[in-house]
Amino acid sequence: MANSSPVYDWFQERLEIQDIADDIGTKYVPPHVNIFYCLGGITLVCFLIQFATGFAMTFYYKPTVAEAYTSVQYLMTDVSFGWLIRSVHRWSASMMVLMLILHVFRVYLTGGFKRPRELTWVTGVTMAVITVSFGVTGYSLPWDQVGYWAVKIVSGVPAAIPVVGDFMVELLRGGESVGQATLTRFYSLHTFVMPWLLAVFMLMHFLMIRKQGISGPL
């Protein structure tokens, strides 16, 4: 590049950043692509909003059965723009699920799951399961009446599974009944385990799309 800066030259010599930029900037976009092919990208934007607003709320949320509800109340009433942060988190969560469902329908109806993109489809379905699990775990965190009974019902569902059902229920709840251990587990899953899992599968998903390209029309 003509008249490049010393900083640019330093990075170019070591990382060949111009080649990366050229590859990204010259990627061919098929002519059949329309607005419905943006649904996956919108889902990603919603996830980034979720990450940012969720991270902000961790500064005030207290994951204990005695203080969870009051900490959410404090966030909503006393923290500057706390009500807005939590509201955006809730709205974006609903939007993320909606965009994900529409994205799955678009991929299925256009045959994007067929060979050679089977693994891309598998990673996408895995991310859909994780996203729904986000909703289940996050619903319980305020630890109000709705959240408490929701987690009690959801954590009791595996009891119907033969042999390992009772073990899975106790693993989810952290004991025989719903309590502090349950809230701690759901908080850990919601704020640490699931975000990392989703990020890993997103990376795999995007790399496969990058390698194989966008599927063609039916």
Swiss-Prot record:
<protein>
    <recommendedName>
        <fullName>Cytochrome b6</fullName>
    </recommendedName>
</protein>
<keyword id="KW-0813">Transport</keyword>
<dbReference type="GO" id="GO:0045158">
    <property type="term" value="F:electron transporter, transferring electrons within cytochrome b6/f complex of photosystem II activity"/>
</dbReference>
<dbReference type="InterPro" id="IPR048259">
    <property type="entry name" value="Cytochrome_b_N_euk/bac"/>
</dbReference>
<keyword id="KW-0249">Electron transport</keyword>
<feature type="binding site" description="axial binding residue">
    <location>
        <position position="89"/>
    </location>
    <ligand>
        <name>heme b 2</name>
    </ligand>
</feature>
<comment type="similarity">
    <text>Belongs to the cytochrome b family. PetB subfamily.</text>
</comment>
<feature type="transmembrane region" description="Helical">
    <location>
        <begin position="189"/>
        <end position="209"/>
    </location>
</feature>
<dbReference type="InterPro" id="IPR023530">
    <property type="entry name" value="Cyt_B6_PetB"/>
</dbReference>
<keyword id="KW-0408">Iron</keyword>
<dbReference type="GO" id="GO:0016491">
    <property type="term" value="F:oxidoreductase activity"/>
</dbReference>
<dbReference type="GO" id="GO:0015979">
    <property type="term" value="P:photosynthesis"/>
</dbReference>
<feature type="transmembrane region" description="Helical">
    <location>
        <begin position="119"/>
        <end position="139"/>
    </location>
</feature>
<dbReference type="InterPro" id="IPR016174">
    <property type="entry name" value="Di-haem_cyt_TM"/>
</dbReference>
<dbReference type="InterPro" id="IPR027387">
    <property type="entry name" value="Cytb/b6-like_sf"/>
</dbReference>
<keyword id="KW-0479">Metal-binding</keyword>
<keyword id="KW-0812">Transmembrane</keyword>
<feature type="binding site" description="axial binding residue">
    <location>
        <position position="205"/>
    </location>
    <ligand>
        <name>heme b 1</name>
    </ligand>
</feature>
<keyword id="KW-0472">Membrane</keyword>
<dbReference type="GO" id="GO:0022904">
    <property type="term" value="P:respiratory electron transport chain"/>
</dbReference>
<keyword id="KW-0602">Photosynthesis</keyword>
<feature type="transmembrane region" description="Helical">
    <location>
        <begin position="93"/>
        <end position="113"/>
    </location>
</feature>
<feature type="transmembrane region" description="Helical">
    <location>
        <begin position="35"/>
        <end position="55"/>
    </location>
</feature>
<feature type="binding site" description="axial binding residue">
    <location>
        <position position="190"/>
    </location>
    <ligand>
        <name>heme b 2</name>
    </ligand>
</feature>
<comment type="subunit">
    <text>The 4 large subunits of the cytochrome b6-f complex are cytochrome b6, subunit IV (17 kDa polypeptide, PetD), cytochrome f and the Rieske protein, while the 4 small subunits are PetG, PetL, PetM and PetN. The complex functions as a dimer.</text>
</comment>
<keyword id="KW-1133">Transmembrane helix</keyword>
<feature type="binding site" description="axial binding residue">
    <location>
        <position position="103"/>
    </location>
    <ligand>
        <name>heme b 1</name>
    </ligand>
</feature>
<keyword id="KW-0349">Heme</keyword>
<dbReference type="GO" id="GO:0031676">
    <property type="term" value="C:plasma membrane-derived thylakoid membrane"/>
</dbReference>
<comment type="function">
    <text>Component of the cytochrome b6-f complex, which mediates electron transfer between photosystem II (PSII) and photosystem I (PSI), cyclic electron flow around PSI, and state transitions.</text>
</comment>
<dbReference type="Pfam" id="PF00033">
    <property type="entry name" value="Cytochrome_B"/>
</dbReference>
<keyword id="KW-0793">Thylakoid</keyword>
<dbReference type="GO" id="GO:0046872">
    <property type="term" value="F:metal ion binding"/>
</dbReference>
<feature type="binding site" description="covalent">
    <location>
        <position position="38"/>
    </location>
    <ligand>
        <name>heme c</name>
    </ligand>
</feature>
<dbReference type="InterPro" id="IPR005797">
    <property type="entry name" value="Cyt_b/b6_N"/>
</dbReference>
